[in-house]
Amino acid sequence: MSCFVQGIFLLQKNVSVLANYVQTVLCYSNIIKGNVIPKTNNETEDFTMKRKMVSALLCATMVAGMVVVPAATAQAADKKLIGVTMPTKDLQRWNQDGENMKKELEAAGYEVDLQYASNDVSTQVSQLENQVANGCDLLVVASIDGSSLGEPLKQAKEKGIPVISYDRLLMNSDAVSYYATFDNYKVGQKQGEYLVDALDLDNQDGPFNIELFTGDPGDNNCNFFFGGAMDVLQKYIDDGKLVVKSGQTEFEQVATANWDSAKAQDRMDTIIAGNYSDGTNLDAVLCSNDSTALGVENALAASYTGEYPIITGQDCDTPNVKNLVAGKQAMSVFKDTRALASAVVKMVDSIMKGEEPEVNDTESYDNGTGVIPTYLCDPVVVTTDNYKEILIDSGYYTEDQIK
Protein backbone atom coordinates (compact mmCIF):
# COMPACT_ATOMS: atom_id res chain seq x y z
CA MET A 1 0.00 0.00 0.00
CA SER A 2 1.41 3.40 -1.01
CA CYS A 3 1.94 6.25 1.44
CA PHE A 4 -0.83 8.13 -0.34
CA VAL A 5 -3.41 5.33 0.11
CA GLN A 6 -2.36 4.79 3.71
CA GLY A 7 -2.84 8.50 4.38
CA ILE A 8 -6.34 8.50 2.89
CA PHE A 9 -7.28 5.37 4.84
CA LEU A 10 -6.12 6.90 8.10
CA LEU A 11 -7.92 10.14 7.39
CA GLN A 12 -11.21 8.35 6.63
CA LYS A 13 -10.91 6.26 9.79
CA ASN A 14 -10.23 9.32 11.92
CA VAL A 15 -13.17 11.21 10.42
CA SER A 16 -15.45 8.28 11.30
CA VAL A 17 -14.23 8.25 14.88
CA LEU A 18 -14.42 12.02 15.07
CA ALA A 19 -18.11 11.94 14.19
CA ASN A 20 -18.80 10.06 17.39
CA TYR A 21 -17.21 12.85 19.38
CA VAL A 22 -18.74 15.82 17.62
CA GLN A 23 -21.16 16.46 20.42
CA THR A 24 -18.41 16.07 22.98
CA VAL A 25 -16.28 18.58 21.12
CA LEU A 26 -19.15 21.02 20.94
CA CYS A 27 -20.19 20.54 24.52
CA TYR A 28 -16.73 20.78 25.95
CA SER A 29 -15.21 23.30 23.60
CA ASN A 30 -15.42 25.90 26.31
CA ILE A 31 -13.74 23.54 28.73
CA ILE A 32 -10.92 22.94 26.19
CA LYS A 33 -10.55 26.70 26.03
CA GLY A 34 -10.64 26.85 29.83
CA ASN A 35 -13.71 29.13 29.92
CA VAL A 36 -16.05 26.86 32.00
CA ILE A 37 -15.44 25.78 35.56
CA PRO A 38 -16.86 22.31 36.52
CA LYS A 39 -18.93 22.10 39.65
CA THR A 40 -17.47 18.92 41.18
CA ASN A 41 -14.17 17.15 41.31
CA ASN A 42 -15.63 14.12 39.48
CA GLU A 43 -16.94 16.33 36.73
CA THR A 44 -13.55 17.98 36.47
CA GLU A 45 -11.82 14.64 36.05
CA ASP A 46 -14.35 13.51 33.43
CA PHE A 47 -14.06 16.73 31.48
CA THR A 48 -10.29 16.64 31.68
CA MET A 49 -10.16 13.09 30.32
CA LYS A 50 -12.47 13.88 27.41
CA ARG A 51 -10.63 17.10 26.66
CA LYS A 52 -7.42 15.12 26.32
CA MET A 53 -9.12 12.53 24.09
CA VAL A 54 -10.57 15.18 21.79
CA SER A 55 -7.31 17.07 21.61
CA ALA A 56 -5.40 13.88 20.80
CA LEU A 57 -7.94 12.91 18.17
CA LEU A 58 -7.78 16.30 16.51
CA CYS A 59 -3.99 16.17 16.46
CA ALA A 60 -4.01 12.67 14.95
CA THR A 61 -6.43 13.73 12.25
CA MET A 62 -4.35 16.77 11.37
CA VAL A 63 -1.17 14.68 11.17
CA ALA A 64 -2.88 12.12 8.93
CA GLY A 65 -3.99 14.86 6.58
CA MET A 66 -0.53 16.36 6.52
CA VAL A 67 1.10 13.02 5.64
CA VAL A 68 -0.79 12.72 2.34
CA VAL A 69 0.71 15.72 0.55
CA PRO A 70 4.38 15.19 1.33
CA ALA A 71 4.13 11.55 0.17
CA ALA A 72 2.73 12.58 -3.20
CA THR A 73 5.26 15.38 -3.49
CA ALA A 74 8.11 12.99 -2.74
CA GLN A 75 6.89 10.65 -5.47
CA ALA A 76 6.87 13.48 -8.03
CA ALA A 77 10.29 14.64 -6.93
CA ASP A 78 11.69 11.13 -7.51
CA LYS A 79 10.78 11.23 -11.22
CA LYS A 80 13.90 12.41 -13.02
CA LEU A 81 13.71 14.93 -15.87
CA ILE A 82 15.78 14.15 -18.96
CA GLY A 83 16.44 16.89 -21.52
CA VAL A 84 16.72 15.72 -25.14
CA THR A 85 17.72 18.11 -27.93
CA MET A 86 17.67 17.16 -31.62
CA PRO A 87 18.98 19.25 -34.54
CA THR A 88 15.87 19.52 -36.71
CA LYS A 89 12.53 18.09 -37.74
CA ASP A 90 13.36 18.67 -41.40
CA LEU A 91 15.16 15.33 -41.72
CA GLN A 92 13.09 12.22 -41.12
CA ARG A 93 15.77 10.41 -39.15
CA TRP A 94 15.88 13.10 -36.41
CA ASN A 95 12.10 12.91 -36.00
CA GLN A 96 12.41 9.18 -35.51
CA ASP A 97 15.38 9.54 -33.18
CA GLY A 98 13.57 12.06 -31.00
CA GLU A 99 10.32 10.13 -30.79
CA ASN A 100 12.07 6.80 -30.17
CA MET A 101 14.14 8.40 -27.42
CA LYS A 102 11.12 10.01 -25.75
CA LYS A 103 9.08 6.82 -25.92
CA GLU A 104 11.88 4.68 -24.46
CA LEU A 105 12.70 7.11 -21.67
CA GLU A 106 9.06 7.58 -20.63
CA ALA A 107 8.58 3.81 -20.62
CA ALA A 108 11.55 3.62 -18.25
CA GLY A 109 9.85 6.05 -15.86
CA TYR A 110 11.48 9.37 -16.76
CA GLU A 111 9.97 12.72 -17.65
CA VAL A 112 11.27 14.01 -20.98
CA ASP A 113 11.77 17.51 -22.35
CA LEU A 114 12.23 16.93 -26.11
CA GLN A 115 13.34 19.90 -28.24
CA TYR A 116 14.09 20.37 -31.95
CA ALA A 117 16.30 23.30 -32.97
CA SER A 118 15.32 23.86 -36.64
CA ASN A 119 19.01 23.58 -37.64
CA ASP A 120 19.68 26.89 -35.89
CA VAL A 121 22.63 26.88 -33.49
CA SER A 122 21.41 29.86 -31.43
CA THR A 123 18.07 28.10 -30.93
CA GLN A 124 19.80 24.97 -29.71
CA VAL A 125 21.97 27.01 -27.34
CA SER A 126 18.83 28.60 -25.85
CA GLN A 127 17.07 25.25 -25.55
CA LEU A 128 19.99 23.75 -23.66
CA GLU A 129 20.30 26.76 -21.37
CA ASN A 130 16.60 26.47 -20.56
CA GLN A 131 16.91 22.76 -19.84
CA VAL A 132 19.80 23.44 -17.46
CA ALA A 133 17.88 26.27 -15.75
CA ASN A 134 14.71 24.16 -15.49
CA GLY A 135 16.48 21.47 -13.50
CA CYS A 136 17.02 18.65 -15.98
CA ASP A 137 18.88 15.80 -14.28
CA LEU A 138 20.66 14.68 -17.46
CA LEU A 139 21.03 15.97 -21.03
CA VAL A 140 21.07 13.98 -24.27
CA VAL A 141 22.35 16.22 -27.06
CA ALA A 142 22.40 15.65 -30.82
CA SER A 143 24.15 18.81 -31.93
CA ILE A 144 23.79 20.92 -35.06
CA ASP A 145 27.40 22.05 -34.79
CA GLY A 146 29.41 20.03 -32.30
CA SER A 147 31.73 22.94 -31.49
CA SER A 148 29.11 25.63 -30.83
CA LEU A 149 27.50 24.55 -27.56
CA GLY A 150 30.33 25.33 -25.17
CA GLU A 151 28.47 27.79 -22.93
CA PRO A 152 25.37 25.70 -22.09
CA LEU A 153 27.57 22.63 -21.67
CA LYS A 154 29.73 24.60 -19.23
CA GLN A 155 26.58 25.55 -17.31
CA ALA A 156 25.54 21.90 -17.20
CA LYS A 157 28.90 20.85 -15.81
CA GLU A 158 28.81 23.57 -13.14
CA LYS A 159 25.47 22.16 -11.95
CA GLY A 160 26.72 18.59 -12.04
CA ILE A 161 24.39 17.57 -14.89
CA PRO A 162 25.74 14.61 -16.91
CA VAL A 163 25.77 14.99 -20.71
CA ILE A 164 25.43 12.20 -23.27
CA SER A 165 26.48 13.19 -26.78
CA TYR A 166 24.01 11.55 -29.17
CA ASP A 167 25.21 10.35 -32.59
CA ARG A 168 27.16 13.58 -33.28
CA LEU A 169 30.14 14.08 -30.99
CA LEU A 170 30.17 17.31 -28.99
CA MET A 171 33.60 18.83 -29.49
CA ASN A 172 36.01 20.79 -27.29
CA SER A 173 34.00 20.44 -24.08
CA ASP A 174 34.98 18.57 -20.92
CA ALA A 175 31.30 18.48 -19.92
CA VAL A 176 30.64 15.45 -22.15
CA SER A 177 30.29 12.32 -20.03
CA TYR A 178 29.52 9.69 -22.67
CA TYR A 179 28.92 9.29 -26.40
CA ALA A 180 26.43 6.97 -28.11
CA THR A 181 26.47 6.49 -31.86
CA PHE A 182 26.86 4.03 -34.67
CA ASP A 183 30.26 2.94 -35.91
CA ASN A 184 30.49 5.84 -38.34
CA TYR A 185 33.86 4.89 -39.75
CA LYS A 186 32.33 1.51 -40.60
CA VAL A 187 29.44 3.33 -42.33
CA GLY A 188 31.94 4.95 -44.71
CA GLN A 189 33.81 1.70 -45.18
CA LYS A 190 30.61 -0.11 -46.14
CA GLN A 191 29.77 2.58 -48.70
CA GLY A 192 33.25 2.38 -50.22
CA GLU A 193 33.26 -1.41 -50.24
CA TYR A 194 29.86 -1.47 -51.91
CA LEU A 195 31.18 0.71 -54.76
CA VAL A 196 34.29 -1.47 -55.14
CA ASP A 197 32.13 -4.58 -55.47
CA ALA A 198 29.45 -3.00 -57.67
CA LEU A 199 32.04 -1.65 -60.14
CA ASP A 200 34.18 -4.79 -59.78
CA LEU A 201 37.22 -2.56 -59.38
CA ASP A 202 39.56 -5.41 -58.49
CA ASN A 203 38.93 -7.09 -61.85
CA GLN A 204 38.08 -4.26 -64.24
CA ASP A 205 40.56 -1.82 -65.78
CA GLY A 206 38.25 1.17 -65.85
CA PRO A 207 38.41 4.06 -65.77
CA PHE A 208 35.13 4.74 -63.99
CA ASN A 209 33.90 8.26 -63.29
CA ILE A 210 32.90 9.07 -59.72
CA GLU A 211 31.84 12.18 -57.78
CA LEU A 212 31.99 12.66 -54.02
CA PHE A 213 29.48 14.17 -51.57
CA THR A 214 29.56 14.32 -47.79
CA GLY A 215 27.74 16.34 -45.13
CA ASP A 216 28.09 19.32 -42.85
CA PRO A 217 31.68 20.27 -41.95
CA GLY A 218 30.57 21.08 -38.40
CA ASP A 219 29.40 17.51 -37.87
CA ASN A 220 32.30 15.45 -36.57
CA ASN A 221 30.68 12.30 -37.99
CA CYS A 222 31.50 13.51 -41.49
CA ASN A 223 35.17 12.93 -40.83
CA PHE A 224 34.39 9.29 -40.08
CA PHE A 225 31.92 8.77 -42.95
CA PHE A 226 34.14 10.36 -45.57
CA GLY A 227 37.36 9.04 -44.05
CA GLY A 228 36.08 5.47 -43.94
CA ALA A 229 34.93 5.59 -47.56
CA MET A 230 38.08 7.26 -48.86
CA ASP A 231 40.32 4.79 -47.04
CA VAL A 232 38.68 2.17 -49.26
CA LEU A 233 38.48 4.18 -52.51
CA GLN A 234 41.67 6.25 -52.50
CA LYS A 235 43.95 3.55 -53.93
CA TYR A 236 41.62 3.14 -56.92
CA ILE A 237 41.71 6.91 -57.49
CA ASP A 238 45.49 6.89 -57.21
CA ASP A 239 45.89 4.14 -59.82
CA GLY A 240 43.42 5.75 -62.22
CA LYS A 241 40.62 3.20 -62.05
CA LEU A 242 38.40 5.84 -60.47
CA VAL A 243 38.38 9.34 -61.94
CA VAL A 244 36.82 12.38 -60.27
CA LYS A 245 36.16 14.53 -63.35
CA SER A 246 35.16 17.59 -61.32
CA GLY A 247 38.52 17.45 -59.54
CA GLN A 248 36.71 17.96 -56.22
CA THR A 249 38.21 15.45 -53.80
CA GLU A 250 39.09 17.43 -50.67
CA PHE A 251 36.73 17.36 -47.70
CA GLU A 252 36.11 21.12 -47.88
CA GLN A 253 35.13 20.80 -51.55
CA VAL A 254 32.70 17.93 -51.14
CA ALA A 255 31.04 18.97 -47.84
CA THR A 256 27.35 19.96 -47.83
CA ALA A 257 26.25 22.58 -45.28
CA ASN A 258 23.53 21.28 -42.94
CA TRP A 259 23.32 18.10 -45.02
CA ASP A 260 20.93 20.10 -47.16
CA SER A 261 19.41 18.33 -50.18
CA ALA A 262 18.97 21.58 -52.10
CA LYS A 263 22.65 22.47 -51.66
CA ALA A 264 23.68 19.01 -52.80
CA GLN A 265 21.40 19.36 -55.83
CA ASP A 266 22.87 22.76 -56.72
CA ARG A 267 26.40 21.41 -56.58
CA MET A 268 25.47 18.34 -58.63
CA ASP A 269 23.78 20.56 -61.22
CA THR A 270 27.05 22.48 -61.59
CA ILE A 271 29.11 19.28 -61.84
CA ILE A 272 26.82 17.85 -64.53
CA ALA A 273 26.91 21.08 -66.54
CA GLY A 274 30.70 21.26 -66.41
CA ASN A 275 31.61 17.61 -66.89
CA TYR A 276 28.76 15.38 -68.07
CA SER A 277 26.49 17.52 -70.23
CA ASP A 278 27.97 16.01 -73.41
CA GLY A 279 26.69 12.54 -72.56
CA THR A 280 29.80 11.37 -70.70
CA ASN A 281 28.81 8.63 -68.28
CA LEU A 282 28.93 9.15 -64.54
CA ASP A 283 29.44 5.69 -63.08
CA ALA A 284 29.12 6.29 -59.34
CA VAL A 285 28.39 8.93 -56.72
CA LEU A 286 29.57 8.50 -53.15
CA CYS A 287 26.97 10.17 -50.91
CA SER A 288 27.52 10.02 -47.17
CA ASN A 289 23.81 10.12 -46.38
CA ASP A 290 20.33 10.03 -47.88
CA SER A 291 19.62 13.77 -47.88
CA THR A 292 22.70 14.47 -50.02
CA ALA A 293 21.85 11.44 -52.17
CA LEU A 294 18.34 12.82 -52.70
CA GLY A 295 19.77 16.12 -53.95
CA VAL A 296 22.07 14.27 -56.35
CA GLU A 297 19.18 12.14 -57.61
CA ASN A 298 17.05 15.23 -58.24
CA ALA A 299 19.86 16.85 -60.22
CA LEU A 300 20.36 13.71 -62.31
CA ALA A 301 16.64 13.57 -63.10
CA ALA A 302 16.71 17.21 -64.24
CA SER A 303 19.72 17.31 -66.56
CA TYR A 304 21.77 14.12 -66.81
CA THR A 305 21.48 12.05 -70.00
CA GLY A 306 24.07 9.29 -69.54
CA GLU A 307 23.72 5.84 -68.01
CA TYR A 308 22.43 5.97 -64.45
CA PRO A 309 25.17 5.84 -61.80
CA ILE A 310 25.53 3.74 -58.66
CA ILE A 311 24.60 5.97 -55.69
CA THR A 312 25.24 5.29 -52.01
CA GLY A 313 23.39 6.71 -49.01
CA GLN A 314 22.71 6.37 -45.31
CA ASP A 315 19.69 6.48 -42.96
CA CYS A 316 17.07 4.72 -45.12
CA ASP A 317 14.80 7.77 -45.27
CA THR A 318 11.48 6.95 -46.93
CA PRO A 319 12.07 8.97 -50.16
CA ASN A 320 15.40 7.20 -50.59
CA VAL A 321 13.98 3.75 -49.91
CA LYS A 322 11.37 4.51 -52.58
CA ASN A 323 14.19 5.51 -54.94
CA LEU A 324 16.08 2.35 -54.01
CA VAL A 325 13.07 0.20 -54.92
CA ALA A 326 12.72 2.21 -58.18
CA GLY A 327 16.39 1.65 -59.09
CA LYS A 328 17.48 5.26 -58.53
CA GLN A 329 19.68 4.54 -55.50
CA ALA A 330 21.79 1.42 -55.11
CA MET A 331 22.10 1.20 -51.34
CA SER A 332 21.62 2.94 -48.03
CA VAL A 333 23.33 2.18 -44.74
CA PHE A 334 20.65 1.53 -42.13
CA LYS A 335 21.22 2.78 -38.61
CA ASP A 336 18.32 1.48 -36.56
CA THR A 337 17.55 4.40 -34.27
CA ARG A 338 15.48 2.09 -32.09
CA ALA A 339 18.68 0.26 -31.16
CA LEU A 340 20.49 3.53 -30.49
CA ALA A 341 17.62 4.87 -28.38
CA SER A 342 17.59 1.67 -26.32
CA ALA A 343 21.34 1.90 -25.77
CA VAL A 344 21.04 5.52 -24.60
CA VAL A 345 18.14 4.74 -22.25
CA LYS A 346 20.29 2.04 -20.63
CA MET A 347 23.08 4.61 -20.29
CA VAL A 348 20.70 7.14 -18.71
CA ASP A 349 19.34 4.54 -16.31
CA SER A 350 22.80 3.48 -15.18
CA ILE A 351 23.94 7.07 -14.65
CA MET A 352 20.81 7.98 -12.68
CA LYS A 353 21.40 4.95 -10.45
CA GLY A 354 24.99 5.98 -9.83
CA GLU A 355 26.36 3.11 -11.90
CA GLU A 356 28.84 3.00 -14.79
CA PRO A 357 27.03 2.65 -18.14
CA GLU A 358 28.09 0.03 -20.66
CA VAL A 359 30.54 1.22 -23.34
CA ASN A 360 32.41 -0.70 -26.03
CA ASP A 361 34.93 1.85 -27.33
CA THR A 362 37.34 3.79 -25.14
CA GLU A 363 39.90 4.71 -27.80
CA SER A 364 38.39 6.16 -30.98
CA TYR A 365 36.41 9.30 -30.12
CA ASP A 366 38.49 12.23 -28.86
CA ASN A 367 36.50 15.48 -28.66
CA GLY A 368 39.53 17.70 -28.12
CA THR A 369 39.52 17.42 -24.34
CA GLY A 370 40.13 13.69 -24.20
CA VAL A 371 38.69 10.37 -25.32
CA ILE A 372 34.96 10.08 -24.60
CA PRO A 373 33.72 6.64 -23.45
CA THR A 374 31.46 5.46 -26.27
CA TYR A 375 28.81 2.89 -27.04
CA LEU A 376 28.75 1.90 -30.72
CA CYS A 377 25.82 0.27 -32.54
CA ASP A 378 26.39 -1.61 -35.79
CA PRO A 379 25.17 -0.27 -39.18
CA VAL A 380 23.68 -2.54 -41.87
CA VAL A 381 23.76 -2.23 -45.68
CA VAL A 382 20.27 -2.18 -47.24
CA THR A 383 19.69 -2.95 -50.93
CA THR A 384 16.79 -4.18 -53.04
CA ASP A 385 17.74 -7.70 -51.97
CA ASN A 386 17.11 -7.24 -48.25
CA TYR A 387 15.08 -4.06 -47.68
CA LYS A 388 11.89 -6.00 -46.90
CA GLU A 389 13.61 -8.11 -44.28
CA ILE A 390 15.52 -5.25 -42.66
CA LEU A 391 12.98 -2.43 -42.87
CA ILE A 392 9.51 -3.96 -43.15
CA ASP A 393 9.67 -7.30 -41.36
CA SER A 394 11.37 -5.58 -38.41
CA GLY A 395 8.48 -3.11 -38.13
CA TYR A 396 10.59 -0.04 -38.91
CA TYR A 397 8.34 0.78 -41.89
CA THR A 398 5.10 -0.55 -43.29
CA GLU A 399 4.85 -1.49 -46.95
CA ASP A 400 2.49 1.41 -47.54
CA GLN A 401 5.09 3.90 -46.28
CA ILE A 402 7.58 3.04 -49.00
CA LYS A 403 5.24 2.48 -51.94
List the model feature ranges, each with a label:
Residues 64-73:
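C-terminal segment of classical bacterial N-terminal signal peptides
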Residues 2, 7, 11, 25-26, ...:
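Intrinsically disordered, low-complexity segments enriched in serine/proline and basic residues
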